[in-house]
Amino acid sequence: MSRTSAGELDVLKVQLKTWERQFLEENGRSPIKEDIKAHPEIRRKYKEYTSLKKLLSKGNAAVTGQKHGSPSRATHPTPQKHIDAEIELGPTPQIYGKVVSLFEMHISPLKKVPVRQLDADSSETCISPDLHSQDVAQSELLTDISCQAKRQLDFSVTPHASPVKAVQPLLLNAPDLRFEAIPHARTKYGPNSPVKFDGDVTLTLSQTPLQAKLAQASEGYSPSPLIKRPAKPLSQLAKEYEDIVEELKEVDHAAAVRNLGGLLQQEEENTQEAEAAEPSATRSDRKRRKNKVRPALVTLEEEIPQGNLHEQLVKLRQKALDKFNGNDPNDSSDEEKKTSATSAKPAKARKRKYNTVSDNFRRLKLPTKNTRNGRWRRR
């Protein structure tokens, strides 16, 4: 069925393509839907071609679905491991019902350490045959103990430091010295002690080359000036000290003069403010009512200096000059008393009036002598 339909589809496709080319050569354009409807035979072939193409596409889809379908696989459960009986652990460290102590630990068996045979003509120190036989016997004994099922620990305390060895003085011209491992370490310490040296460990000490210091000291030139210590002579240091002392004196004098000038200027400002604060007697009562700002009450008694500071300084200078010239200071004191008596004037007691609240308002705006209201003049 599928082969015949595929062959018919190919035949119809060839027939339709030949007709389309003939139509293109005759009319100069490709056929459209109206041209196909005008030829019933060609229309029937187009319908048959589309139906066969649909059948072939459905058959191919069914075949591909069967081809890629995965068969059902049988599920095999994962085999479970054999579960041993649960191990019960109590409050004390134990395993399999047996109490475990710190001394019952599993230690791996010791390995046999091969002993290197040293030649007679070698530069290294050789071990005596008695010590060698003793080491071999001890290693065999340790291997026999390790093969047993249980072991008993040695309770001897292992030292925390290596033994002290008497160091021999080294000669400068001696050749390179090579020390073999300490032969007594095998007999004194256990096989697993960290202090024990193996048989193939060697320590090499080489001679440090000496520098020819005497040859350098015998050279006939002076050292570089950069290496010398940068120091000043005592005369220069004394001169710098005197300059610093003079500068400090000048600074102190300038500060004292500046402070005196500031005090004099502040005194003049205070006197000007006091003169400006005194009320004038020619002011009218109406203008006084407008000024409602009153000074605050004085809580602390301020110490006001008596007299003018500038005048006092002038007097002191005059006294010093009179004393230097040999004049009598009593005459100057009498003059000071006269000037102080004339300058001291009795302070006038100012009468203060208690202003009521009603004084802030005016009931009628009547004409007065000092008013400049023009509306009363026009009547």
From Swiss-Prot:
It holds the Pfam family Drc1-Sld2. Residues 67-78 have a biased composition (Polar residues). GO terms for biological process: DNA replication initiation; double-strand break repair via break-induced replication; mitotic DNA replication checkpoint signaling; mitotic DNA replication preinitiation complex assembly; negative regulation of protein-containing complex assembly. Gene3D superfamilies: 1.10.10.1460. Its main location: cytoplasm. Residues 60-79, 263-292, 322-379 are annotated as: Disordered. InterPro entries: DNA_rep_checkpnt_protein, Sld2. Keywords: Cell cycle, Cytoplasm, DNA replication, Nucleus. Belongs to the SLD2 family. Has a role in the initiation of DNA replication. Required at S-phase checkpoint. This is DNA replication regulator SLD2.
